[in-house]
Amino acid sequence: MNTVRGTFLLVFGLAASLGQADKNENRREMQKKTEQGKSYLNFAENLLLQKLEELEAKLLEKHSKKSKNSRQKRCIGKDVPCDENDPRCCSGLICLTPTLHGIWYKSYYCYKK
C-alpha cells in the first residue's frame, strides 16, 4: 500500500513540476488565439455584410419594378379612341387604326394585341 502511495506522490510531483508552463508562453498562446478569433470574426462579419447587401439589392429591385397586382390608373380601355403620339392604352392593348367600325370617327383605337 505504501508503494502505491509513494508511486502516486512521485508521479504527482513530476506532473506538477514538469507540467507547469511558462506564464508568458500562456499569454502569447492566448493572444494568438484571440487574434485568430478576431480575424475570423472580421471575415465572417464582412461575408455576412456582403450577403445582406446582395439581399437588400434584390429586395429593392423587386420593389422598384411595377407590381403585377397593382392596377393601372388612367389608361384607355378596349375600343376607345387613343392618340397615336401618346397612346395610354391599358396593358394588353395597343393603339391601332380601326378596321371597320369607327373609321369615320378618330383614326386610332385601343385594340387587343
From Swiss-Prot:
It is found in: Secreted. One of its GO terms (cellular component) is extracellular region. Keywords: Disulfide bond, Ion channel impairing toxin, Knottin, Secreted, Signal, Toxin. Residues 22-74 form a propeptide. InterPro entries: Toxin_22. Residues 1-21 form the signal peptide. Belongs to the neurotoxin 14 (magi-1) family. 01 (HNTX-16) subfamily. The presence of a 'disulfide through disulfide knot' structurally defines this protein as a knottin. This is U11-theraphotoxin-Hhn1m.
